Structure formats: structure tokens, C-alpha cells
Amino acid sequence: MADEIAKAQVARPGGDTIFGKIIRKEIPAKIIFEDDRCLAFHDISPQAPTHFLVIPKKHISQISVAEDDDESLLGHLMIVGKKCAADLGLNKGYRMVVNEGSDGGQSVYHVHLHVLGGRQMHWPPG
């Protein structure tokens, strides 16, 4: 977890991201789901027994800069996350998280929904 905090503290918006490369299939990922609007894949550094990301194919660097026109797309990410969670057997529950900015722990400046499950989640999360 400390590694993710360090990454978030130095990450900056702008330019291409690792997620853009995954969308373009320039680097491999364990893809769970894909449609014309988004992609879901397993996190390379899982923080729970099941941990995957759902990302829009449209580049949106942060939730704070999303446009009103992105509302349907952002909602779609949650619906896809719910369906993938069910497909992966997370029937006892799961957590959905979007990190925003460096203090929020955002380490990649391409909006992404974390879905974590497979164990009891704790509160508070931070």
C-alpha cells in the first residue's frame, strides 16, 4: 500500500498512461470484460483476493474534470463492475472505489473504478 501512496504523490495528469496502452492492446492485461465504452481487467497489484479495475475507453484524467456528458459513461462503469463482480462470485459483497488526485491516492491519471472483494472490507478505508 505504501508503494501506491508513493506513486500517487508523484503521478501527474497529462500524456499517455498505462491504461491507454492496455486499451490499445500494446501491453497485456487479464481482461474480464470489454465493450465499445469500457474495459475491465484484473489489477496488477491486487489489494484483495479479487481486485479488478473498470476503465472508460475515453480518456478522462480525473473525476474532477469529467463533463456532464460523461454521466452515462461513468454510470456504465459501475454497472459493468457489478456484473463482473457477480461473474467472479463476489456474492457476499465488494467495495467500489475511485481515487481522486494525489491525496486521494490516484496513481494513474485515467479514471478507473477499483472493485475489491473476496474478504471482509474494513472501515474506515484510509
Curated annotation (Swiss-Prot):
Effect of residue 97 to E: Loss of dimerization. Strongly reduced adenosine 5'-monophosphoramidase activity. A 128-fold increased affinity for 3-indolepropionic acyl-adenylate and a 1000-fold increased affinity for tryptamine adenosine phosphoramidate monoester
Main localization, broad class: cytoplasm
Active-site residues from the entry: 112 (tele-amp-histidine intermediate)
GO cellular component: cytoplasm; cytoskeleton; cytosol; extracellular exosome; histone deacetylase complex; nucleoplasm; nucleus; plasma membrane
UniProt keyword Aminoacyl-tRNA synthetase present: no
Gene3D superfamilies: HIT-like
Motif stretch (Histidine triad motif): 110-114
Protein's UniProt keywords contain Acetylation: yes
Pfam families cross-referenced by the UniProt entry: HIT
InterPro entries: Histidine_triad_CS, Histidine_triad_HIT, HIT-like, HIT-like_sf
Effect of residue 43 to N: Approximately 50-fold increased affinity for tryptamine adenosine phosphoramidate
Function summary: Exhibits adenosine 5'-monophosphoramidase activity, hydrolyzing purine nucleotide phosphoramidates with a single phosphate group such as adenosine 5'monophosphoramidate (AMP-NH2) to yield AMP and NH2. Hydrolyzes adenosine 5'monophosphomorpholidate (AMP-morpholidate) and guanosine 5'monophosphomorpholidate (GMP-morpholidate). Hydrolyzes lysyl-AMP (AMP-N-epsilon-(N-alpha-acetyl lysine methyl ester)) generated by lysine tRNA ligase, as well as Met-AMP, His-AMP and Asp-AMP, lysyl-GMP (GMP-N-epsilon-(N-alpha-acetyl lysine methyl ester)) and AMP-N-alanine methyl ester.
Oligomer status and interactors: Homodimer. Interacts with CDK7. Interacts with RUVBL1 and RUVBL2 and is associated with the LEF1/TCF1-CTNNB1 complex and with a KAT5 histone acetyltransferase complex. Identified in a complex with MITF and CTNNB1. Interacts with CDC34 and RBX1, and is part of a SCF (SKP2-CUL1-F-box protein) E3 ubiquitin-protein ligase complex. Interacts with SUMO1, SUMO2 and RGS17. Interacts with the Ten-1 ICD form of TENM1. Interacts with CALM1; interaction increases in the presence of calcium ions.
Name by which UniProt lists this protein: Adenosine 5'-monophosphoramidase HINT1
Gene: HINT1
